[in-house]
């Protein structure tokens, strides 16, 4: 077993092809999908450092990283840290089969060596501890601190029953549910159905302004400057206009 890697400073054709192909066989959330990442990249000026990790020439992981300057400090972080509720690597679904902790840490050390001349701090925030049925090595292998906890929706009944319960809720609750659901790869189809229920609630389209106001409140609670919300709004409006969500 041999690990190798390649670093992309932009989402060029090769990078996009690898990423697009990977989405069919890899585990990731909505925030690591290529169409969302591309919107983020278009609206920020951070330096991209997308790392593709190979095991015997087979892609097993994509690390969507960027270097952002905070005042005079260059920070390595996940792409979209300010906007995404979940910031994770993108791992192949058979990652466990190809994972060797020692090899992974060695290759990570080499990657960091390449970044070092322009890097002052590594800050990986909003990570999932477990991705599908395997542990996130960036949480498992390094010392981490819990800043806060969030709880995702757990569907304990058939979707039709759940949908009926949504009809009984007011529009505000429906928007909150929809906003949460669209974030997750596994719940894409469900999120579209929730979107239909919102339209049935006397609304012609998804109320982006309403969602943004709620997101701004989240950003405020995280002490993130309000100026970020305007970029967030632009990103999601573009996605909705293009019918990607």
Task: For every predicted segment, state its role.
Residues 2-56, 60-76, 126-150, 158, ...:
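A conserved beta-strand-loop-helix scaffold within acyl/acetyltransferase catalytic domains
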Residues 81-119:
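A gly/proline- and charged-residue-enriched helix-loop-helix capping module
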Residues 91-94, 153-157:
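Short beta-strand-to-loop capping motifs
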Residues 118-127:
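Divalent metal-dependent hydrolysis catalytic cores, especially in the metallo-beta-lactamase
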């Amino acid at each position: 077993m041999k690990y190798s890697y390649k670093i992309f400073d932009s989402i060029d054709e090769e990078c996009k092809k690898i990423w697009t192909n990977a989405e069919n066989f890899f585990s990731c959330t909505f925030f690591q999908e290529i169409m969302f990442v591309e919107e983020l990249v278009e609206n920020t000026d951070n330096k991209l450092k997308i790392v593709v990790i190979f095991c015997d020439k087979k892609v097993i992981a994509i690390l969507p990283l960027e270097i952002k300057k905070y005042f005079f400090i260059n920070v390595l972080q996940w792409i979209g840290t300010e906007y995404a509720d979940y910031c994770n690597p993108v791992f192949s679904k058979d990652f466990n089969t190809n994972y060797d902790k020692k090899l992974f840490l060695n290759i990570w050390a080499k990657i960091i060596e390449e970044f070092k001349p322009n890097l002052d701090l590594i800050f990986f925030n909003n990570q999932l501890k477990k991705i599908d049925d395997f542990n996130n090595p960036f949480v498992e292998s390094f010392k981490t601190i819990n800043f806060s906890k969030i709880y995702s929706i757990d569907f304990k009944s058939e979707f039709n029953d759940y949908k009926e319960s949504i009809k009984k809720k007011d529009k505000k609750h429906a928007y909150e549910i929809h906003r949460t659901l669209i974030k997750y790869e596994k719940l894409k189809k469900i999120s579209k159905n929730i979107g239909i229920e919102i339209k049935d609630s006397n609304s012609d389209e998804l109320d982006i302004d309403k969602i943004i106001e709620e997101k701004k409140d989240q950003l405020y609670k995280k002490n993130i400057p309000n100026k970020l919300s305007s970029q967030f709004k632009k990103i999601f409006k573009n996605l909705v206009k293009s019918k990607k969500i």
